[in-house]
Amino acid sequence: MENKFYKNLNSESILQIYKLGIFPMAKSRCDEKIYFVNPKKRALLPIKDFHVSKSFSRFIKKKPFYITVNKNFKKVINRCATENRKDTWINKTIENHFNNLHEIGVAHSIECWKNDKIVGGIYGIAIGGCFFAESMFSSVSNASKFALINL
């Protein structure tokens, strides 16, 4: 999609494009430019119909991690951009915009902790009754899934 939003990109314009089903991406972490994706279809996971396997349910019952919400948004988005990845669509511009969205209460993170260290997490934007999960990371097996389950 043409970058018609790019010149005036701010928290409000990002929210407006999300409401249209469009989302920003970068070609790489070091690319300063942002382009906008307008897919014909978007995946939707209704939370009430979300199925958790029996084996993962058993894993959850062991309480392998503890969860916090919005405790360290900046760390979560940064680790989503850098953790175990050669490259990412999350450049510094996008990271900064999402940090601003977090400061105004629209972007949120769920953090998974083990032994006082963040070992997994997910972040996204909440608009109305929808949560647009943008990315997640895990440095310990199943931590990002555990964060997703705790949305």
Model regions: which residues?
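N-acyltransferase acceptor-side catalytic subdomain
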Residues: 1-151
